[in-house]
């Protein structure tokens, strides 16, 4: 049993560090407007003008923060910091508190409603 669990852990870590995290670092970083692209097509192309959602951004923050905490790679810290900055700069409502549900591609507020679901991820 211990061998099976160890093997599964190794496979999952390999998938995470060899595929999942590199995909986000290499294909989803929005170098024009900051943060990460809101959407890509089924063939991996950016969808211009796609909105960005707070839940996805918060999940990216959690994922890269956790990856850095466990694996201590500076590139993961850089991505976590990028996601945190996006959350604070564009999703956080500096006037009334809480987080916007979504922002436009350029980071301007789009759907300004406050949902407890989104707040849970942002916290």
Give the ranges of each region predicted by the language model.
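Glycan-recognition and catalytic cores of secretory/periplasmic carbohydrate-active enzymes
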Residues: 1-123
